[in-house]
Amino acid sequence: MSTFIGQLFGFAVIVYLVWRFIVPLVGRLMSARQDTVRQQLADAAAAADRLAEASQAHTKALEDAKSEAHRVVEEARTDAERIAEQLEAQADVEAERIKMQGARQVDLIRAQLTRQLRLELGHESVRQARELVRNHVADQAQQSATVDRFLDQLDAMAPATADVDYPLLAKMRSASRRALTSLVDWFGTMAQDLDHQGLTTLAGELVSVARLLDREAVVTRYLTVPAEDATPRIRLIERLVSGKVGAPTLEVLRTAVSKRWSANSDLIDAIEHVSRQALLELAERAGQVDEVEDQLFRFSRILDVQPRLAILLGDCAVPAEGRVRLLRKVLERADSTVNPVVVALLSHTVELLRGQAVEEAVLFLAEVAVARRGEIVAQVGAAAELSDAQRTRLTEVLSRIYGHPVTVQLHIDAALLGGLSIAVGDEVIDGTLSSRLAAAEARLPD
């Protein structure tokens, strides 16, 4: 019995424990599970609602998309039609513009081609004419005939007056011109008393004094002070050169410094000019003036075609003695004998360049030699040598036209083809065949 009671008590305890601890826990678990199931059912219902709404939205979106697509297609069709119309109108305008531009371009090209053809035809005509002229004047008789025809035309020209150009006077102002004229006139009288040796010595001493004055600028300035009383200037030049030069040279220097000069350099130019007049007086006494003039002009032309020689002779960095030695070597190697007066004149000129280009100085010297006889220099260009009769006739015609004796300096240039080119001072008479062809070519259209 007690066993039964004990078992019953144990069962009761177990039931109590189950009821006390297990049942509440299981109840809570069941309640939580029920809540979870209910929540899942609610979520499923909400999801079903959302699915339905999504289906409706999808259907509506499809309908809206179809409607929008239809609208876009219609707008695109309208825009395409409008763009097509605009492009068609623009194409018409562009086609018209291109057509007009093409017409203008065709006109322009036609004008250019016409002008080019005219130009080429003109150049070809001039070229053919040049060939015909060259072939024509290949015969010396025909070439000489062109000179004769030009002389006939020149002979018919109205006489024109021309004064003798005294190169040094042209460089000076009025006071120096008067002084130089007076000095040269005085020297012309004084030179009559000097013999060959006296004139040669005088020329050399004057060049030495001119070089001295060129180096001593202060002394030259005192010698050209424009004072009425020339005594101080005369005493200064006497103290400077007495015992170093001869009496004729000292007398020339006294006379020179007693004059009034417009510029300091004019006194040096005047002294150099008198030295040249002394040498030219020697040539005139020996009847060699024409030879001297011709050789001076010939040497001037040599310097024009030999620039290297001109540079060497005009290099003032080299002592004057060295340049003079070079000049004398060149003259010694000349094909023909050079007149001693020419050698002296050129040597003195190279010594007294004073910064001037040697080719200009030599040409100036040649013009001084010509002007001494009151002659006009005519620079004549010809395609070939003139005959004696043509040269004589040219000299006579030019002398009659200009009213003064004329010295002809002939320059041969085969490129002139025929006729003559004459330059007297600033006046140029160009009757060459080459100039006429060049003028014809210059008149061609650009």
Curated annotation (Swiss-Prot):
Residue ranges of the TM segments: 4-24
This protein's UniProt keywords: ATP synthesis, Cell membrane, CF(0), CF(1), Hydrogen ion transport, Ion transport, Membrane, Multifunctional enzyme, Transmembrane, Transmembrane helix, Transport
GO CC terms, sorted: peptidoglycan-based cell wall; plasma membrane; proton-transporting ATP synthase complex
Subcellular location: Cell membrane
Pfam families linked to this entry: ATP-synt_B, OSCP
GO terms, biological process: proton motive force-driven ATP synthesis
UniProt entry tagged with the keyword Transport: yes
Gene Ontology molecular functions: proton-transporting ATP synthase activity, rotational mechanism
Source domain of life: Bacteria
UniProt membrane topology term: Single-pass membrane protein
Residue ranges of the region described as ATP synthase subunit b: 1-168
Record region (ATP synthase subunit delta): 169-446
PANTHER family, per database record: ATP SYNTHASE DELTA CHAIN (PTHR11910)
Assembly: F-type ATPases have 2 components, F(1) - the catalytic core - and F(0) - the membrane proton channel. F(1) has five subunits: alpha(3), beta(3), gamma(1), delta(1), epsilon(1). F(0) has three main subunits: a(1), b(2) and c(10-14). The alpha and beta chains form an alternating ring which encloses part of the gamma chain. F(1) is attached to F(0) by a central stalk formed by the gamma and epsilon chains, while a peripheral stalk is formed by the delta and b chains.
Other notes: Was identified as a high-confidence drug target.
Similarity comment: family membership: In the N-terminal section; belongs to the ATPase B chain family.
Described purpose of this protein according to its UniProt entry: F(1)F(0) ATP synthase produces ATP from ADP in the presence of a proton or sodium gradient. F-type ATPases consist of two structural domains, F(1) containing the extramembraneous catalytic core and F(0) containing the membrane proton channel, linked together by a central stalk and a peripheral stalk. During catalysis, ATP synthesis in the catalytic domain of F(1) is coupled via a rotary mechanism of the central stalk subunits to proton translocation. This fusion protein includes a component of the F(0) channel (subunit b) and of the F(1) subunit (subunit delta). Two copies of subunit b and one of delta together form the peripheral 'stator' stalk which links F(1) to F(0).
Descriptive protein name: ATP synthase subunit b-delta
Organism of origin: Mycobacterium tuberculosis (strain ATCC 25618 / H37Rv)
Gene: atpFH
